[in-house]
């Protein structure tokens, strides 16, 4: 987020050496102390009011602290118009997205990017999430496929697979004849659950039941491995498995197996 290029930034009385402040800013970002980092950005801006890097860093710090309203307030401040040449469309759109205004978030991205195909990977990821929330699943699917063609093997691959699986399940529910579930290893209970939803939408009850049962097992195993003594984690697991069991009961009912009540009550 920050760099050491802050040396000799232009201030009201001429060039100002801010290299020491930027070195400290990097350290604060590495330990994720965004509160102190934000205050340090303010100090830099006090001596170099036109330092766009410091302003950008400050916006990111506020975003990391979930101060979304404050970010939007800063971006709308007439006193900050001098930074309008800096692309802060991602930060602005993300704030609107987190404040549950997906339509406004998409408007910001469209206004800035012009062509979605020329966007950065971060902008594309955010656009896909926004489109999903707006239930524009076909466009969302196209973006995820485009992203995954160019980013296979990175740290977010499994998360994208899970999201794409959810998109495919919704497309199947909407009756999209061109939709197919993405081929992949089902190495997480979230992907299995989404594949089960895909099968439910297609009326493939047996396949849905199999995936839901395996998803519940994987969910329990994952929770046991990671959070043996965490009561809150146990509550989260109960909520997750509860959702899975409700879907399983529905699938069994559609199969007319007669076991749906037992599944929910166990």
Language-model-detected regions and their locations in the chain:
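Helix-start (N-cap) detector for alpha-helical repeat units in TPR-like alpha-solenoids
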Residues: 18, 52-53, 86-87, 120-121, ...
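"A position-specific structural signal for the A-helix of alpha-solenoid helical repeats
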Residues: 23, 57, 91, 122-133, ...
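Alpha-helical repeat scaffolds
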Residues: 40-42, 68-80, 102-113, 139-147, ...
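TPR-adjacent "capping" and linker segments in tetratricopeptide-repeat scaffold/adaptor proteins
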Residues: 2-20, 43-48, 116, 179-188, ...
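Short coil turns that delineate tetratricopeptide repeat
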Residues: 49, 83, 117-118, 152-155, ...
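Alpha-helical segment of the N-proximal tetratricopeptide repeat
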Residues: 17-43, 57, 191-202
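Structural motif corresponding to the intra-repeat A-B loop/turn of tetratricopeptide repeats
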Residues: 31, 65, 99, 134, ...
């Amino acid at each position: 987020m920050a760099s050491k290029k802050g040396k000799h930034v232009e201030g009201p009385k001429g060039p100002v050496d801010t290299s020491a402040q930027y070195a400290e800013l990097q350290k604060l970002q590495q330990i994720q102390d965004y509160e102190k980092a934000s205050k340090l950005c303010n100090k830099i801006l006090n001596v170099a009011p036109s330092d766009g890097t410091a302003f950008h860093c400050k916006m990111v710090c506020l975003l990391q602290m979930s101060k979304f309203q404050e970010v939007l307030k800063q971006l709308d401040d007439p006193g900050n118009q001098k930074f309008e040449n800096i692309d802060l469309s991602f930060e602005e759109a993300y704030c609107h997205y987190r404040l549950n205004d997906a339509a406004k978030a998409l408007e910001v991205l469209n206004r800035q990017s012009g062509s979605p195909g020329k966007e950065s990977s971060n902008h594309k990821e955010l656009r896909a999430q926004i489109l999903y929330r707006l239930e524009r699943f076909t466009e969302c699917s196209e973006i995820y496929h485009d992203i995954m063609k160019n980013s296979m093997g990175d740290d977010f691959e499994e998360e994208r697979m899970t999201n794409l699986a959810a998109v495919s399940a919704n497309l199947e529910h909407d009756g999209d004849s061109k939709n197919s579930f993405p081929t992949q290893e089902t190495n997480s209970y979230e992907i299995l659950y989404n594949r089960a939803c895909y099968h439910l939408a297609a009326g493939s009850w047996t396949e849905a039941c199999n995936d839901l049962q395996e998803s519940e097992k994987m969910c329990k195993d994952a929770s046991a491995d990671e959070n043996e003594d965490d009561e809150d984690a146990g509550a989260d697991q109960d909520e997750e498995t509860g959702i899975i069991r409700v879907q399983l009961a529905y699938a069994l009912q559609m199969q007319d197996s007669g076991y749906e009540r037992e599944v929910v009550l166990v």
